């Protein structure tokens, strides 16, 4: 075959292949048009429930992806529109003991994985799920930028959330808002998240609702505007949030803001007998919200704010019981104080919580009176009102030989049942300042929920070995 014949043969073959490709394309186009215009489909294969576009692409051919995506978007919009504001209609369940709810082992896993440096963690639920929350430091435990993460406030912190009992990684964390102080809660329709950022003398809060910024609040005392560091609570769409601006070791200006869909309905200055308020841990029941806070100025006993979200009013006092629950603190006295701080905290403190329910009252505190180590739950009937109330029952959560930290309350208000199950978390701080062989400060989380059974207890430490990081 001479060269001209070879060229003719090759051209003819290419022409035939091209014609076949065009015909296949026409047939494929016709099939696609037919599938899109077909009024109904008795498909035997069920559509996946994924609402995320990337998940849908994995599970479907491209021409089906568009159909599924549009359908799921409609479902999401309809579900959000049909959801009602949550109403706090139930009381607390009887609490006889505490069972394990979640544990993320973040520091242990972070020894060889991309786990984010965090602090100030908490738990918050919505109608679909409960998630862990924390303030990230914008770096991983093993990253070089983890040097200096002992500091609370920087431009690199943000509020993140991630699946319950998983460690917070660069792959599974969702940024809720940017800042170094936060709170977040779901009203039944959508989530409100608040983040505070900026320099100490000029910080501001941005209020996000349904993942969009809605309102801003500027500093009023120019001294580290700050908020709860755990979840807020909503009643029929009204979500009270406690803010403080001012000295941590002297008088400060505390305000209670009432939000609805991220917008301010009202705010009022602190009233009642509490002298200093920081880092409130709140829960809701019977249409009211109760917040147990930190008096960093004078009190080893904890101040309490009781909020009526319907009337948008509040009052405050101290837990009357002589069972002191801040840290540091003196030994428990014989008689407590209801309207004044009990001295002995040396201008210091730690975030904490309680469930104040008459004879069903439980208080949480570190076991150590001098450092953030150990954690225990104590049943102290009528602790809010009885200045001689004593523990009648207890449960150790973390042994005193292991580090603890902040703690706070949360509840799943959408769980089935005739009452709300009380829950709490404990921050397990590792690294600096106590473990100064490493350059970072981070934490893991353990969380517990109440049981009507009398369950056994166990130690739930962080469990990471610092020498593995050296």
Swiss-Prot record:
Q: How does it assemble?
A: Homotetramer.
Entry membrane topology:
Single-pass type II membrane protein
| List of glycosylated residues | 42, 52, 63, 66, 87, 147, 202
* Post-translation changes: N-glycosylated.
The family assignment reads:
Belongs to the glycosyl hydrolase 34 family.
Q: Which CDD domains match?
A: Influenza_NA
Reading the lineage from the top rank, the first entry is Viruses
Virion surface topological domain ranges are 36-470
Q: Where in the cell is it found?
A: Virion membrane; Host apical cell membrane
What more the UniProt record tells us is:
The influenza A genome consist of 8 RNA segments. Genetic variation of hemagglutinin and/or neuraminidase genes results in the emergence of new influenza strains. The mechanism of variation can be the result of point mutations or the result of genetic reassortment between segments of two different strains.
Query: Record's HAMAP family?
Result: INFV_NRAM
Which reaction equation describes what this protein catalyses?
A: Hydrolysis of alpha-(2->3)-, alpha-(2->6)-, alpha-(2->8)- glycosidic linkages of terminal sialic acid residues in oligosaccharides, glycoproteins, glycolipids, colominic acid and synthetic substrates
What Gene3D superfamilies does the record point to? Answer: 2.120.10.10
Which GO MF terms does the UniProt record name?
exo-alpha-sialidase activity; metal ion binding
Q: Which cofactor does it need?
A: Ca(2+)
Annotated Ca(2+) binding sites: 295, 299, 326, 348
Transmembrane intervals: 15-35
Q: In its UniProt entry, what is this protein called? A: Neuraminidase
Residues on the membrane's Intravirion side span 1-14
Q: In UniProt terms, what function does this protein have?
A: Catalyzes the removal of terminal sialic acid residues from viral and cellular glycoconjugates. Cleaves off the terminal sialic acids on the glycosylated HA during virus budding to facilitate virus release. Additionally helps virus spread through the circulation by further removing sialic acids from the cell surface. These cleavages prevent self-aggregation and ensure the efficient spread of the progeny virus from cell to cell. Otherwise, infection would be limited to one round of replication.
List, alphabetically, the GO terms of the cellular component aspect.
Answer: host cell plasma membrane; membrane; virion membrane
Supply the gene name.
NA
Organism per entry:
Influenza A virus (strain A/Whale/Maine/1/1984 H13N9)
**UniProt enzyme class:** hydrolase
Please summarize the record's notes on activators and inhibitors of this protein: Inhibited by the neuraminidase inhibitors zanamivir (Relenza) and oseltamivir (Tamiflu). These drugs interfere with the release of progeny virus from infected cells and are effective against all influenza strains. Resistance to neuraminidase inhibitors is quite rare.
Its principal location? Answer: virion
Q: Which UniProt keywords apply?
A: Calcium, Disulfide bond, Glycoprotein, Glycosidase, Host cell membrane, Host membrane, Hydrolase, Membrane, Metal-binding, Signal-anchor, Transmembrane, Transmembrane helix, Virion
Which residue stretches belong to region Involved in apical transport and lipid raft association? 11-33
């Amino acid at each position: 075959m001479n060269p001209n014949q070879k060229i003719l043969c090759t051209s003819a073959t290419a022409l035939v292949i091209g014609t076949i490709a065009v015909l296949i394309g026409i047939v494929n186009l016709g099939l696609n048009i037919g599938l899109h215009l077909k009024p109904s489909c008795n498909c035997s294969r069920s559509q996946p429930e994924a609402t995320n576009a990337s998940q849908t692409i994995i599970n479907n051919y491209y021409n089906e992806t568009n159909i599924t995506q549009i359908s799921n978007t409609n479902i999401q919009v309809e579900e959000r529109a049909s959801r009602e504001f949550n109403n706090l209609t139930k009381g607390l369940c009887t609490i006889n003991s505490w069972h394990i709810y979640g544990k993320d082992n973040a520091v242990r896993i972070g020894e060889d994985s991309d786990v984010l440096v965090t602090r100030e963690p908490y738990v918050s639920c919505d109608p679909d799920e409960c998630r862990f929350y924390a303030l990230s430091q914008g770096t991983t435990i093993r990253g070089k930028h983890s040097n200096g993460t002992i500091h609370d406030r920087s431009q690199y912190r943000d509020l993140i959330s991630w699946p319950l009992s998983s460690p917070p990684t660069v792959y599974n964390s969702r940024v809720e808002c940017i800042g170094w102080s936060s709170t977040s809660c779901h009203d039944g329709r959508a989530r409100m998240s608040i983040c505070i950022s900026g320099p100490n003398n000029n910080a501001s809060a941005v209020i996000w609702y349904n993942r969009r910024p809605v309102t801003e609040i500027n500093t009023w005392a120019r001294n580290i505007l700050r908020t709860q560091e755990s979840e807020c609570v909503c009643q029929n769409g009204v979500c009270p949030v406690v803010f403080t601006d001012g000295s941590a070791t002297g008088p400060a200006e505390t305000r209670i803001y009432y939000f609805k869909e991220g917008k301010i309905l009202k705010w009022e200055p602190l009233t009642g007998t509490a002298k200093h308020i920081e880092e409130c841990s709140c829960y809701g029941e019977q249409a009211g919200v109760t917040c147990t806070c930190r008096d960093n100025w004078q009190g080893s006993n904890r101040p309490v704010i009781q909020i009526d979200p319907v009337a948008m009013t509040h009052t405050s006092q101290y837990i009357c019981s002589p069972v002191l629950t801040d840290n540091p603190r003196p030994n428990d006295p014989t008689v407590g104080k209801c309207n004044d701080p009990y001295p002995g905290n040396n201008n210091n403190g730690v975030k904490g919580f309680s469930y104040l329910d008459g004879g069903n009252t439980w208080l949480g505190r570190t076991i150590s009176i001098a450092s953030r180590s150990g954690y225990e739950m104590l049943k102290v009937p009528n602790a809010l009102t009885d200045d001689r109330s004593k523990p009648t029952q207890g449960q150790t959560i973390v042994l005193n030989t292991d580090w603890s930290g902040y703690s706070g309350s949360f509840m799943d208000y959408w769980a089935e049942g005739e009452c709300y199950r009380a829950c709490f978390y404990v921050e397990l701080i590792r690294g600096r300042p106590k473990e100064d062989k490493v350059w970072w400060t981070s934490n893991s989380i353990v969380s517990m929920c109440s049981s009507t059974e009398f369950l056994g207890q166990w130690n739930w430490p962080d469990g990471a070995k610092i020498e593995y990081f050296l």
